[in-house]
From Swiss-Prot:
The gene is RUVBL2. Forms homohexameric rings. Can form a dodecamer with RUVBL1 made of two stacked hexameric rings; however, even though RUVBL1 and RUVBL2 are present in equimolar ratio, the oligomeric status of each hexamer is not known. Oligomerization may regulate binding to nucleic acids and conversely, binding to nucleic acids may affect the dodecameric assembly. Interaction of the complex with DHX34 results in conformational changes of the N-terminus of the RUVBL2 subunits, resulting in loss of nucleotide binding ability and ATP hydrolysis of the complex. This is RuvB-like 2. GO terms for molecular function: ATP binding; ATP hydrolysis activity; DNA helicase activity. Gene3D superfamilies: 1.10.8.60, P-loop containing nucleotide triphosphate hydrolases (3.40.50.300), RuvB-like helicase, domain II (2.40.50.360). GO terms for biological process: box C/D snoRNP assembly; chromatin remodeling; DNA recombination; DNA repair; regulation of transcription by RNA polymerase II. Pfam families: TIP49, TIP49_C.
Amino acid sequence: MATVTATTKVPEIRDVTRIERIGAHSHIRGLGLDDALEPRQASQGMVGQLAARRAAGVVLEMIREGKIAGRAVLIAGQPGTGKTAIAMGMAQALGPDTPFTAIAGSEIFSLEMSKTEALTQAFRRSIGVRIKEETEIIEGEVVEIQIDRPATGTGSKVGKLTLKTTEMETIYDLGTKMIESLTKDKVQAGDVITIDKATGKISKLGRSFTRARDYDAMGSQTKFVQCPDGELQKRKEVVHTVSLHEIDVINSRTQGFLALFSGDTGEIKSEVREQINAKVAEWREEGKAEIIPGVLFIDEVHMLDIESFSFLNRALESDMAPVLIMATNRGITRIRGTSYQSPHGIPIDLLDRLLIVSTSPYSEKDKKQILRIRCEEEDVEMSEDAYTVLTRIGLETSLRYAIQLITAASLVCRKRKGTEVQVDDIKRVYSLFLDESRSTQYMKEYQDAFLFNELKGETMDTS
């Protein structure tokens, strides 16, 4: 009789590393200012634009103090002068506690909701509410867990949990749900845990130092903590930070919290918002909550129409308004939705309410420094001559085009088994990928070969 041997496959364990995507502004860590709000020439990923960065630093201090609401700042300048970079630097400098919402001007035009609703939601997303609440917790080291399972296999489990601190020891009776939570979290004797009395949530803090010498197989991530002292039951203040929009969505309908994850918020009634405002004001009076005025950044603000600008005028006067930062690269142009022209495509009455910060074109030295920072961010090694050629391309075309050539040149370099990007790699990708001016030149030369051409009869000097 043949014997069959069963082979068990051992699953292969792979290290899952988190991939950080490199974006256009991922190299920016802050505004690069010192304690006196003086900008450094190159710091935290920011280069040049000293006056604009100093102005942004002053606005940043006003936001941090939280004393102002409804102030609006316009960052105006030519394309490629770092307007969005300054706004991203402000977001990084503010940190995760201050709400920062970034939208583009064209995002508010949707078939699902009105323009004013989209703007209102963006405003409410930018205002945080820090809610303080006191909860009772049980904190101690697990001495023993006894679980009595019914002999039949069916029925509810019961058990006892022994917890201790340096001063006392207590036995707690356990129900079925608590036993399931302890089993799920793999809690065992020697673990230091906290139990929230209101919700029954169990949090594992680590292993007790008294068990450090026990013979046990444990991973490098095992954390050892002191055995808690004092009483087992303690009162702890927990701080939650949520945005007004999140409170709106949760209260707008039954199971509204699910809409936070799906994104299908829809239009929210003004009555709901008024009730929430009244409740938040009440919490504020009682000292339970505080308002954190955040930042709403609207890029390409000239894309808004006259109705949206009219709404912004009114919204900025509200006491629940965040600091509004807008960016535009337009000069004197037509206001969308009208036949009138205005500076930056923004009505005069709104311009009167704005603090305007202007950005100037980067110098050759600044562009070279920015390209160096981008090469470091993208892990690309480049020779000094290649930097000079790339800077020259950036001056003649645009900084964005030069930055986009970095990755392409790096790929060409790797294909020829090189380690450092040389001038030939830059020249090759420059010949492969056209910039805006060379593309326009090509179209004008071969305009008759294209299917549609609106420059009929126009001649161009291509010399």
